[in-house]
A protein has these predicted regions:
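Alpha-helical transmembrane segments
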Residues: 2-171
């Protein structure tokens, strides 16, 4: 990436951290999506013998335990501290493994969540009050369209799993 490495790193980290934070709006959404991404990083790190398997594996284990209490109806919530830490984990792991552009693939849900907010705010200001989505981030739009909370989480998790498979094929 040359001289673009620093600005790309900056936007990738900020975007990923905020993307995970925006995703943390439904019971189990951020934790289930990030669990799938963490499994992807664990599988890839084992294949690459990168040495970070204990870290990625610990995050997988931690998220599995956390999800027991975070799925609908949630008894425990991660809050900003948890979601920002998970975003930092995803961005940091991608960079340590020298695959920062893979964040766009495996973190597609994070990207969509951030873009939905940016698009909504920009359009709202440009049109003096009109909206593209019923609500942003987009997981709330789907809720207002009649999807249950568990359906949104399931669909977003399946999309993440498919994108992780695509990323594995791209290696």
């Amino acid at each position: 990436l040359g001289w673009l490495a620093v600005p790309v790193l900056f936007f990738a980290v900020i975007g990923t951290v905020n993307g995970v934070n925006f995703t943390d709006g439904l019971d189990g959404l951020a934790s289930s999506v990030t669990l799938i991404v963490a499994v992807f990083f664990t599988v890839v790190s084992i294949g690459m013998k990168s040495g970070i398997e204990p870290i990625t594996g610990a995050v997988v284990g931690g998220l599995m335990g956390f999800l027991l209490f975070n799925v609908y109806p949630a008894k425990v919530f991660m809050g900003d501290t948890g979601s920002l830490a998970l975003g930092g984990f995803v961005a940091g792991t991608a960079y340590v493994m020298q695959m920062p552009l893979f964040i766009l693939i495996v973190g597609l849900i994070y990207l969509i969540e951030v873009l939905s907010v940016i698009i909504q705010v920009t359009y709202f200001k440009a049109t003096h009050g009109k909206r593209i989505f019923k609500m942003a981030p987009i997981h709330h739009h789907f809720e207002l369209c009649g999807w249950s909370e568990t359906r949104v989480v399931a669909v977003f998790s399946v999309i993440t799993a498919v994108m992780c498979m695509v990323a594995l094929l791209a290696l």
